[in-house]
């Protein structure tokens, strides 16, 4: 067992970890502190080098993913009842890494009609970026009881 991230403050939370495609980086959602400052964070397991990309409150999502080269990230957004308490967070988001150690956000799909509340019949979108970086794939429930898999073409949204 190996420690990847150590908390640095009271109320700091991290979660929903995922591996980079090459297996060298553990990525995770980081909040310092909870519900206030948001990051896409990663730690290289070979070197221990950490990287953080700050994201705004409305950019936060429950589940994140990355492209094979870790230059694109996506998440599934969230509603007002979730930890970010965002007022405009119900989007499938795409983030592009910038040379300045930041990311830019692109809103791909308006999820305002989607039911995020799994305890009330909803579904978690659980986004994925295709290996060719052309699509973001996710599950959506835009009408009661109708869960489907969707794909949004990244290039078409730009």
What is each model feature region?
Residues 26-29, 72-76, 135-139:
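Residue position within the beta-strands of beta-propeller blades
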Residues 44-48, 98-100, 155:
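Short loop/turn segments that connect beta-strands within beta-propeller blades
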Residues 53-63, 102-131:
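Conserved blade-ending motifs and adjacent loop-strand segments that build the rim/top face
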Residues 123-158:
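Blade-level signature of beta-propeller repeat domains, shared across WD40, Kelch, NHL, RCC1
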């Amino acid at each position: 067992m190996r420690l990847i991230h150590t908390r640095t403050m009271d109320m700091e939370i991290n979660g929903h970890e995922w591996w980079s495609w090459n297996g060298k980086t553990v990525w995770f959602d980081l909040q310092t502190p909870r519900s206030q400052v948001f990051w896409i964070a990663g730690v290289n397991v070979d070197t221990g080098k950490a990287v953080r990309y700050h994201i705004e409150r409305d950019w936060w999502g429950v589940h994140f993913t990355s492209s094979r080269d870790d230059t694109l990230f996506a998440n599934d957004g969230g509603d007002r009842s979730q930890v970010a308490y965002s007022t405009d967070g119900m989007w499938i988001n795409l983030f592009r890494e910038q040379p300045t150690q930041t990311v830019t956000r692109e809103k791909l799909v308006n999820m305002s009609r989607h039911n995020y509340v799994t305890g009330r019949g909803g579904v978690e979108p659980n986004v994925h970026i295709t290996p060719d970086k052309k699509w973001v794939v996710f599950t959506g429930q835009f009408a009661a009881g109708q869960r489907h898999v969707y794909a949004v073409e990244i290039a078409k949204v730009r």
